[in-house]
Amino acid sequence: MSEEVGAKRWYAVHTYSGYENKVKKNLEKRVESMNMTEQIFRVVIPEEEETQVKDGKAKKLTKKTFPGYVLVELVMTDESWYVVRNTPGVTGFVGSAGAGSKPNPLLPDEVRFILKQMGMKEKTIDVEVEVGEQVRIKSGPFANQVGEVQEIEADKFKLTVLVDMFGRETPVEVEFDQIEKL
């Protein structure tokens, strides 16, 4: 199987069950601190929302589709492989044939199916904002806050917005679909 060198691909990573969120957070921190943003792009925990009715009240629950697994979008290099494998809570890559062998990426159709199930797409969001423009955050913990775009990370579909909190400008990282231009 010929594989494009330097291509961004999705890989499944095995974690301790129940540690998926911690692994995602740890890996995202390591990517930033080890300056791997050009090689490791997104970390996704496959989840789906379920509505459960209890005592006559509907309650939305988020359920892990594949407990014990996290998807990582990366360019497979020795460095990116090392960073992911040595993240606390990661037990290994799925599709790795043993010690020292690199794993096989997930098939594009598999990734599209999983992301579609989660209500996500292989992101192709076109954001019409530029650094310095004012935006309103539509969702998340900073919903309805207005701030100035400080940085745009198109490859990660994220941007940094400066919002006023307690009289200070604070940088907040949000995804493209969480903002609207003013």
From Swiss-Prot:
Participates in transcription elongation, termination and antitermination. PANTHER family: RHO-INTERACTING TRANSCRIPTION TERMINATION FACTOR NUSG, TRANSCRIPTION TERMINATION_ANTITERMINATION PROTEIN NUSG. This is Transcription termination/antitermination protein NusG. Keywords: Transcription, Transcription antitermination, Transcription regulation, Transcription termination. Pfam families: KOW, NusG. The lineage of its organism: Bacteria, Bacillati, Bacillota, Bacilli, Bacillales. Belongs to the NusG family. One of its GO terms (biological process) is DNA-templated transcription termination. SMART domains: KOW, NGN. It comes from the Bacteria. Residues 131-163 form the KOW domain.
